[in-house]
Amino acid sequence: MHAANPVNVAGLLLAAGAGRRMGRPKALVELGGVTLVERGVRLLTAGGCRPVVVVTGAAADEVGIVVRRLATRRVAGPAPAGWDAPEIGLEPTAGLIPEVRLVSAARWTEGVGASLRAGLAALVGTDTDAVVVTLVDQPSLGAAAVQRLISAAADPGSAHPAMTATYGGRPAHPVLLRRSVWPEVAALARGEAGARAWLRAHPGEVTGVPCDGTGSPADVNTPADLETPADLETPADLASGDTHTQPG
């Protein structure tokens, strides 16, 4: 049995990519007047995640400036032994968004797997029970989807160590991972697979949580994708915590 229902749920925003098809790092792209990295942080915060860890790579300094608008100090330390992760830099905030931390993934060019490993490693020494993972290039996700995953995982009848949002029955982000499976997920996270390798290898340990009507998991990969984003929450929604919900 993989255990206990989460009490403390962190958010993990993977924002390290170079965005080659976009022409610049997606984290710095603005949509609705908000950079995608800030939008992702606000999404996870509005969904109930504390802290929110942002993993950077390409244009780390520039992305860090955006996040540091909320941050006040830096704490550095080595990665936990055996996690194959770089030196971790954590930056707690004390401003608009509580508890936001920056983690630099030195091996980000290897793919999203390296970013996921670095993010999980940063949370090993915390009291976090589970983590909700999102990607910076999915700006139309709804905070209500994050809330549904956390609620489903907290259900006393829920024993599965992983949850995925589903849209029309198809699994997508956000993904919730209990602490008990982080080492297994990290071991399989290579290249562009991220958590997908573990999820596919353990279908019987994954709960699908219907999130239709909460937003869209559609990626933005090119400038053309920015012209018609699906179900985009406004900056005011993200700031206030108001989110897409399914009627009824």
What are the residue ranges of the model-derived segments?
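Conserved alpha/beta core of the MobA/IspD/sugar-nucleotide pyrophosphorylase nucleotidyltransferase superfamily
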Residues: H2-V7, R190-G248
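Phosphate- and divalent-cation-binding pockets in alpha/beta enzyme and binding domains
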Residues: E62-V63, E184, D219, T228
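Nucleotide and nucleotide-moiety/phosphate-recognizing core
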Residues: H2-P171, R179, H202-G213, A224
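Short, glycine-/small-residue-rich phosphate/pyrophosphate-handling segment
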Residues: R170-H202
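Conserved protein kinase catalytic core
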Residues: A143, E184, S216
